[in-house]
Amino acid sequence: MNHLQVIREDKQLRILLMQECDILFYDQFKEVEFSQNNEVYSLSHTAFAKDGSGGEYVILEDESIGFIGSEGQVGRVAESLDDLLTFLLHAGSISDFSCRLLYKNKELLAKFCQGFTNKIRENYQSKGEVWDKVRAGLAQELGLEFKPEKLQELALKFYQSAIRTPRFTCKYGHAEDEYVCDSILSDIIGLWVSDLVGMSREEIMNFSN
């Protein structure tokens, strides 16, 4: 967790990470904000950062990284802080890569990752910026690797962390009123996914079977 202290002590780096990777680091560890409804989490944890929507990143008891979303989704997202930061440097956020069906077919995931990279480069170019240069500079400050061609590999690592056991889950309520929080992986195929792979929802579903 060496990067944690470095980031906490560097205000400019924290601002850059929020702007580029949608992660705002807290000054210190804190209890998660989503603990007011008698939630029972499967693993002990402590919050160290949040995203723009209010979801929180937590360090789990095995030192892997979990995420508790503002819309009720819960799960593991990385095996270490370095892995999380490396993924975010390439992906920008975890939500864009949360569609479970993408990981059922390597060709489909490859198409999505290439489409994502092309689109994000276009977006930066429209602002007069070079995505590769911006992210490579941030990676250098963090002492981490930035290789866009490895996005598919990094996405698979994210997926594998999310599905491995013991899973990071949450439930609340009692008996018939007990509710289990959604996984961070979703079966929803958004327009974003369809646009990037150039396929309809039905085509994606057939492709992933």
Question: Can you name each region flagged by the protein language model?
Answer:
Residues K111-C113:
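Eukaryote-specific, cytoplasm-facing alpha-helical/coiled-coil scaffolding segments in long proteins
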Residues E71-E107:
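Compact, glycine/acidic-enriched structural inserts
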Residues M1-G72, C99-K104, F116-N209:
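A surface-exposed partner-binding patch
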